Amino acid sequence: MTTAKSGTTIEIIGAVVDVEFPRHAVPKVYDALQVDENNLTLEVQQQLGDGVVRTIAMGSTEGLKRDIAVKNTEKPIEVPVGKETLGRIMNVLGEPIDELGPINSKEKLPIHRPAPSFIEQSGATELLETGIKVVDLLCPFAKGGKVGLFGGAGVGKTVNMMELIRNIAIEHSGYSVFAGVGERTREGNDFYHEMKESNVLDKVALVYGQMNEPPGNRLRVGLTGLTLAEAFRDEGRDVLLFIDNIFRYTLAGVEVSALLGRMPSAVGYQPTLAEEMGALQERITSTKKGSITSIQAVYVPADDLTDPSPATTFAHLDATVVLSRQIAERGIYPAIDPLDSTSRQLDPLIIGEEHYRVARGVQETLQRYEELKDIIAILGMDELSEDDKRAVRRARKIQRFLSQPFFVAEVFTGAPGKYVSLQDTIRGFKGIINGEYDELPEQAFYMVGSIEEAVEKAKSL
C-alpha cells in the first residue's frame, strides 16, 4: 500500500537501492527513508526522474526484496548530541551499540549541516601541548587546528592517536569525540577498554562504522562524529575530534560511486573526491563560540604520499605528522619523521624565539647527518672532519631522544609511559645541540622522558 509519503523498492544492487515514489512526493537529496520490514535506513543520493530516487543503505541489504514499502521521514539522518553521548558507543544512526540502554539526549541534530560562515569562524594560534616530545618540538598542534597522522600499514597511527587522546583527556580534561571509520573492530574494542582503564571514558563519545560494515555506514559515520563534536563546540567548549581513518572515508565513497553510476577518475577514485573531502573538512573548524581540534589518521596506500586520497587530505591540514617505516625499523617509537613532519605553528611569532631556534637546530643537525650518511657508508666515520663527527654523534642522540615510552603501549613494552612538558622538551634538546651531553652514551637517550632520566640512565650503563 502506497501513501503520499511512502514508496516501494524497485531495484537493489549491493548497497544501492532504487525507490519509486508518487511524482508529487519525491524525497529531497539526503532525506532519510525508513524500511520498516528490515529495520533499515536509506539515504537519498540522486533523483533519477519519474519519481525514482537512488539511495545508499545504512546497513546490510541482505534479505531486502523488490516491492517493499519505504517511508520518507522528510528529514536527514538525525543523531543524539550532548553530554548523554559521553562514554557511549554509537553507530552511524546514533543508536547505542554498547548494550547499556538508550541514549536519552534532549536534542537531536541532522548529520548534514552547512559549514560555519566566514564571519562565524575564528583563527587559531594557541598551542595544544600533547606531552609527546617530537610533536611538541617539531610539529606543534594549534587549538582549533587540523592535524593529519600519515603512515602506511602498521607504523603506529592508531597507537599515536590513542596516546594523544589519553594525554589530552587526562592532562587537559577536555571532551573528545572518536569516529572509527572503517577500522578494525578489534582496535575499536581495545580502544574502548583502554579508555575505560585510564578512567577517561566519561569524556569521550565513540562512533563506530567498522571495516565489516556496508559502505553507506563508513561513508557517513565521519559526519555523525562531526555532528557530535559541533554540538559540544556550539555549547562553548574546546572539543577534540579524532577520525581513524580518513582514507576509509574516501574508500567508502569509491565503493558507492560506481554503483551510483559515476565515471571513475584518477586511480579509480570517485570524481567527487575533492568535494566530498571538502564537505567534511570545512565543517571541522573553530567558531567564536568554541573550537574543534581535529586529529585524523591518514592511511597512505603503498607509502605513496602522491596518491589522490592523501594528497587531497594534505590541502586541508595545519600540521602533518608523517610516520616513517625506516624509523620504525630502527625501533624508534613514536616513528615520527622529524624532517618530513610540518606545522604552520612552527613560527617564532607563535611559539617564541627559543622554541623556534631549538626546533630548527634539531632539524639542521639531523639533516646534516642525512647528508653525511653516504660518505659514512662508503668511507667510514674516520674520514669526517671533527665538526662533522660531532654533528653525527649529536644527531644520533637526538634520534634516540625523540623516542618516548607511551602510556597506551605499556602492555607491549613493559616500560611506564611518560608525559613530557614543552619546557622540559625544549630544555633537553637545547642541551643536546649545545653539546652539554656530549659525554653521555647514545643508549642513555633511548626510550626516556625528560633529559634528567637520560642522565640517570647513563649512570647505570
UniProtKB/Swiss-Prot annotation:
Location, primary (coarse class): membrane
GO cellular component annotations of the record: plasma membrane; proton-transporting ATP synthase complex
Keyword terms, alphabetized: ATP synthesis, ATP-binding, Cell inner membrane, Cell membrane, CF(1), Hydrogen ion transport, Ion transport, Membrane, Nucleotide-binding, Translocase, Transport
Signal peptide: none
CDD domains to which the protein is assigned, alphabetical: ATP-synt_F1_beta_C, ATP-synt_F1_beta_N, F1-ATPase_beta_CD
Functional note: Produces ATP from ADP in the presence of a proton gradient across the membrane. The catalytic sites are hosted primarily by the beta subunits.
Identification of the protein by name: ATP synthase subunit beta
